[in-house]
């Protein structure tokens, strides 16, 4: 009987993903991949998502200081089998070593966009108006309590 599919990852998937993220970060930090694009770039692994069968690991990476981030991600995908072999030593407890897929992490860009929106004059004006209302409400409550 097939299991019902859920949208949220299981506890095991989360635990394994975190172990894979640590092992992958250590491998990239040691600089074992011989590729000019990757050697000259610091690559941050922000998240790893595992497939339900734990055979595919999608790593979300942020190439820091790289001009062409897509080229760095493409180079990582090109060297995915090499990375898989290097990470396998740290993940000996796994029955199957996952296949690695690298994707560009856009969460930092989204954070910056939201931060810019929050700092915009329109939002600041609305927040100031809300602050004025709450101050007026507090002053009114203080007068009522006296």
Swiss-Prot record:
<keyword id="KW-0690">Ribosome biogenesis</keyword>
<dbReference type="GO" id="GO:0043024">
    <property type="term" value="F:ribosomal small subunit binding"/>
</dbReference>
<comment type="subunit">
    <text>Monomer. Binds 30S ribosomal subunits, but not 50S ribosomal subunits or 70S ribosomes.</text>
</comment>
<dbReference type="GO" id="GO:0005829">
    <property type="term" value="C:cytosol"/>
</dbReference>
<feature type="region of interest" description="Disordered">
    <location>
        <begin position="125"/>
        <end position="146"/>
    </location>
</feature>
<protein>
    <recommendedName>
        <fullName>Ribosome-binding factor A</fullName>
    </recommendedName>
</protein>
<dbReference type="Pfam" id="PF02033">
    <property type="entry name" value="RBFA"/>
</dbReference>
<comment type="function">
    <text>One of several proteins that assist in the late maturation steps of the functional core of the 30S ribosomal subunit. Associates with free 30S ribosomal subunits (but not with 30S subunits that are part of 70S ribosomes or polysomes). Required for efficient processing of 16S rRNA. May interact with the 5'-terminal helix region of 16S rRNA.</text>
</comment>
<dbReference type="InterPro" id="IPR015946">
    <property type="entry name" value="KH_dom-like_a/b"/>
</dbReference>
<dbReference type="InterPro" id="IPR000238">
    <property type="entry name" value="RbfA"/>
</dbReference>
<dbReference type="InterPro" id="IPR023799">
    <property type="entry name" value="RbfA_dom_sf"/>
</dbReference>
<dbReference type="InterPro" id="IPR020053">
    <property type="entry name" value="Ribosome-bd_factorA_CS"/>
</dbReference>
<comment type="similarity">
    <text>Belongs to the RbfA family.</text>
</comment>
<dbReference type="GO" id="GO:0030490">
    <property type="term" value="P:maturation of SSU-rRNA"/>
</dbReference>
<keyword id="KW-0963">Cytoplasm</keyword>
């Amino acid at each position: 009987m097939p299991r019902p599919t859920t949208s949220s990852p299981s506890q095991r998937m989360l635990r394994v993903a975190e172990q894979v993220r640590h092992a992958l970060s250590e491998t990239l930090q040691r600089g074992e991949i011989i590729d000019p694009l990757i050697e000259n770039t610091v690559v941050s692994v922000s998240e790893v998502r595992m497939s339900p069968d734990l055979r595919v690991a999608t790593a979300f990476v942020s190439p820091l200081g790289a001009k062409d981030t897509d080229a760095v991600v493409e180079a990582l995908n090109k060297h995915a089998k090499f990375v898989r072999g290097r990470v396998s030593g740290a993940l000996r407890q796994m029955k199957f070593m996952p296949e690695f897929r690298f994707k560009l992490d856009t969460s930092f860009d989204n954070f910056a966009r939201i931060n810019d929106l929050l700092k915009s004059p329109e939002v600041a004006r609305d927040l100031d108006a809300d602050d004025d209302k709450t101050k007026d409400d507090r002053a009114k409550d203080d007068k009522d309590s006296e």
